Amino acid sequence: SITLDLSRPQGRRLARKLVGISDVVLENFTPRVMFNWGLDYDHLQKVRPDLIMVSLCGMGQTGPWRNFAAFGATIQALSGLTYLTAYTPDQPIGLGYAHADHAAGLSATNGQGGG
């Protein structure tokens, strides 16, 4: 495996090279981050026209929350899951682990292979 520092130009250059020989890109940044780095779908499709790209931006690609990061605990709270797992209505506690993070990753990997 490799690690790329996408905040650096050389990391982004290497990422684009890898896209050229890849079938699928899966990422979980906010849309603003990928666009600013030139690594959003519109840019990467020019490198590899038949690219499959899966974006796990938890707050969506559009809408007022699109540039907010989504973490498992945040999504659990916003969805009402922390309320459902509370001992009492005034003390929500959540699941104790990031169920939403695992579910999102599993759904994304299953979804990209379905075409």
PLM feature segments, named:
Residues 1-46:
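A structured beta-alpha segment of the ubiquitous adenosine-cofactor-binding alpha/beta core
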Residues 35-115:
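Active-site-adjacent "lid/gating" segments in soluble enzymes
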